[in-house]
Structures are given as C-alpha cells and as structure tokens.
C-alpha cells in the first residue's frame, strides 16, 4: 500500500505544480520570449506563496509581478534601477539560472572608454 500512497502523493504534487504554472501563465506578456517567460515564471512561482493577496486585497501579488518585471528587465534588457530595489530582486532570484544572457555596456563604462 505504501507504493500506492507514494504514487498518489506524486500525482498530487504534479497536479499542484501544473495548477501553479497555469495560474502564472495569465501574467505572461505577449512580448516575452519563451526564455524570458520561463525565467520570470520561475521567479514568480518561487515567491508566490509569500505574495498571495490577503482578503483585504492589499496588492501583494501586484508587487510580486512588478518585482519579477524589474528583474527580467534588468537581466534581458539591461535596464537600471535603484540599488536597493536591484539588490532585493537579485537576492530573490538567487539560484535561478538563465543561460546566454545578453551583455550590456553601461553609460559609465562608455564614458570611461571615451575619456581614455
């Protein structure tokens, strides 16, 4: 009977993961590539339990979605943000691996090259 219980537990886990992914899919932007979306969805799903909206509707989910966009925009588009905000999202994303990220040159790096 233990094998049957284990199989049921695995099926329940898989079902929960599927439901979470289906829930997150509604937040995908039409302009996101598959690579960008998979990374951002991992960010969202990782923190979703901590950012579920309470009954008073205080917008915790909106905050999580905004943080996920800050992280994705920084990673994939090279956008810059306030240091505290960037530190927060980078800490939240710790352990999420994204391959073949674009390389960006900052304005200050360009200015240093120009002055040399």
Curated annotation (Swiss-Prot):
<feature type="domain" description="XRN2-binding (XTBD)">
    <location>
        <begin position="24"/>
        <end position="116"/>
    </location>
</feature>
<protein>
    <recommendedName>
        <fullName>CDKN2AIP N-terminal-like protein</fullName>
    </recommendedName>
</protein>
<keyword id="KW-0007">Acetylation</keyword>
<dbReference type="Pfam" id="PF11952">
    <property type="entry name" value="XTBD"/>
</dbReference>
<comment type="subunit">
    <text>Interacts with XRN2; the interaction is direct.</text>
</comment>
<feature type="modified residue" description="N-acetylmethionine">
    <location>
        <position position="1"/>
    </location>
</feature>
<dbReference type="InterPro" id="IPR021859">
    <property type="entry name" value="XTBD"/>
</dbReference>
<comment type="similarity">
    <text>Belongs to the CARF family.</text>
</comment>
